């Protein structure tokens, strides 16, 4: 499943839960045999991690794995959070499994239709007025947002538009003690024409918004494609970053030695800045059993 489709579906509350099983839609439709097979293929011994990193994982990368099964696997692996979830998935995850949702999905308008377009502001505010109080009530610390595509718009005009549109949303976030984070994405490979595609642009937007409750989601995969200099950028701009995502380059697959980034050094650099937020695995597994890849990724990043 592609990221855009996954985010759109989750924002509308369509996830791993099927209808007709109470308000949380918790009934799993996948065969039990599939779940058992996955349980056998990764180490079922509960992980004892170093405790320096708050580990999370993006559900959309494991779209064929029921949320219930993924949550159980996360508990075994020592992962504290499953993120970018729609509202229907929050309560089952948090109440039934004691896990966190580090980032709630935002407006159903999605990645391409964001705050850089003034015509979207009314709907974005309406959506966030619904999402933010509910997320905060469950202790979810962050809600994601996007700049939107350029569609011929000048970057500075788009930045000003974003700042104006974000102002009432961020004020609401401040009131509820929750953060709004805008994701940095690459516009070369995955999200052609996306505006918030360089760290410096994002940093300037954060300065314009001027609130401790608005930060960037620094996606290491995306920014390696766009600008490189990952560790230097993290050291320079860490105060503007509220969350991190991983992914192998090229290909957005496993973060092992099949790709060009050395994640132990990157994660150590993140920790050296004093970062205490979440680091989420957002690579697309290539193994027959994706949970093996997830477990490997956690070990690589557990510095």
Language model: regions and residue ranges:
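Histidine-acidic metal/acid-base catalytic patches
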Residues: 2-75, 140-141, 196-218, 222-303
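Active-site acidic/histidine proton-transfer and metal-coordination neighborhood
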Residues: 10-18, 45-49, 116-215, 225
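Short acidic, glycine/proline-enriched helix-loop-strand junctions
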Residues: 90-104, 178
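Active-site-proximal loop/turn and secondary-structure-junction residues that shape catalytic pockets
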Residues: 61-63, 86-88, 107-109, 149-151, ...
